[in-house]
Amino acid sequence: MPEPRLRVGLIQGRETLRFRLDGLFHLLVDDAPEPTARVGGRWRAECGPDGIALWRHGAREPLLTGRRLLLRPLVEGESSFLLHEMTVGVDFHWQHDEDLSFLGCLSLEAREASSAGARMDAVNEVGLEAYLLSVISSEMSARCPTALLEAHAVISRSWLL
């Protein structure tokens, strides 16, 4: 049985998003079955009335525009992506922005235009085990007893499934 895949919302309602692809990724546009390109490096996505324009760092023209841009690693687990200025601790006293890295696919999805203008969401499509590893390492201290870390993994896996 294949490992379950999860769609985890990372960023909601942004006009612009800066990110870095560490490794090579296939770029699929608007649910196309075949990749449009192989990409890596630094990028900027800007949401407008025609969808999401994808700009290579320093470029004068966007590479392409689409309603959904899926960046899928050529080899799962060997490449990651870094999102700049991600807000963590939303609505808590410790809310702040930081740059965070993720394994799996990055999906940039245009929302329906509203009075707030064109916006996009960033979604991480990732395998269950990679997700659990990231959750446990982000929520628990490395100094926790092994039994506590194992219990957290069992609880998290049970909750997801």
Positions of predicted regions on the chain:
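Conserved, single-site charged/polar hotspot
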Residues: 1-161
